[in-house]
């Protein structure tokens, strides 16, 4: 009887039921969690890492924006809260740490439970519907510490789409051809703007095409403009830079 009671307590400890479970603490994940909570739903936000905000708090502090007036709702609210931090009405360029604190404030104000450092391990379905997911500790995975999460609605807000893929739903990867939806800027595009200000010679020996291409320049022939493919955007490191002499630290060359 004692053993059965211990197993029951352990099972309850590692099982949680909510209205909405959101996988991925990206900016979209945080806002989705906050919105659901403000609508009166019980919410669990699962983040595989230790930080909230995704790219917004991970180094992408320069917002790609054309017409700011198309930004509304909680996105606009976010940028105005950023602005408030800097003593302005709104702010589109910011420090990642400031963005993360704003996202933390959203989950705190929304009373959203956040499960950090847990990644997807298994998806259980009832027919075509997800009934439960199992997550494991990202830093020290062990079946003993796995957690079962049951929810009426699951939302995948991760960048990789792991929950989506494990659930077996249809999806596509890459960029579609212009012809698929009768659009203009899909697929292969020759960059007419956003180029380096200073020309970079592509050859190992500048000006000598026989010397080969420098690292990162592809030998592939460019396909016609608008052609679709299965390629995804490159993964990059993003860092904060400054032109303020009082805020500078040297960028040192690695030993290798």
Regions picked out by a protein language model, each given a short descriptive name:
Residues 1-3:
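Sec-dependent signal peptide recognition
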Residues 5-17:
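Bacterial Sec-dependent signal peptides at the C-terminal "C-region" and cleavage site
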Residues 11, 141-153, 157-256:
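Flavin (FAD/FMN)-binding glycine-rich loop and adjacent Rossmann-like elements that form
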Residues 14-28:
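Beta1/beta-strand and adjacent pyrophosphate-binding region of the FAD-binding site
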Residues 25, 137, 158:
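Glycine-rich, N-terminal phosphate-binding loop of Rossmann-like dinucleotide-binding domains
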Residues 27, 34, 119-121, 133-135, ...:
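Mobile, glycine-rich extracellular loop/lid and propeptide segments
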Residues 35, 41-42, 47-126, 172, ...:
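Conserved N-terminal/central alpha/beta ligand/cofactor-binding core
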Residues 124-148:
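Conserved beta-strand-loop-beta-strand element in the redox core of flavoprotein oxidoreductases
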């Amino acid at each position: 009887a004692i053993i059965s009671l211990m197993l029951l307590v352990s099972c309850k400890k590692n099982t949680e039921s909510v209205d909405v479970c959101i996988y991925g603490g990206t900016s979209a994940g945080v806002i989705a969690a906050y919105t659901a909570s403000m609508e009166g739903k019980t919410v669990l936000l699962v983040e595989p890492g230790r930080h909230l905000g995704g790219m917004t708090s991970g180094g992408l502090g320069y917002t790609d924006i054309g017409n700011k007036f198309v930004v509304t709702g909680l996105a606009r609210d976010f940028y105005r809260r950023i602005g408030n931090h800097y003593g302005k009405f709104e702010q589109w360029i910011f420090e990642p740490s400031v963005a993360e604190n704003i996202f933390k404030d959203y989950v705190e104000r929304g009373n959203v439970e956040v499960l950090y450092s847990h990644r997807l391990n298994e998806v259980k379905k009832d027919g075509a519907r997800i009934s439960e997911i199992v997550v494991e500790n990202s830093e020290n995975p062990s079946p003993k510490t796995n957690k079962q999460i049951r929810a009426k609605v699951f939302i995948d807000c991760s960048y990789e789409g792991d929950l989506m893929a494990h659930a077996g739903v249809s999806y596509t990867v890459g960029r579609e051809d212009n012809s698929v939806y009768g659009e203009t800027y899909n697929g292969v595009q020759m960059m007419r703007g956003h180029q380096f200000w200073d020309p970079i010679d592509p050859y190992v020996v500048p000006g000598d095409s026989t010397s080969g291409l420098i690292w990162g320049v592809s030998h592939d022939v460019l396909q016609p403009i608008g052609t679709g493919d299965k390629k995804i955007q490159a993964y990059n490191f993003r860092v904060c830079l400054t032109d303020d002499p009082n805020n500078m630290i040297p960028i040192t060359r690695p030993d290798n």
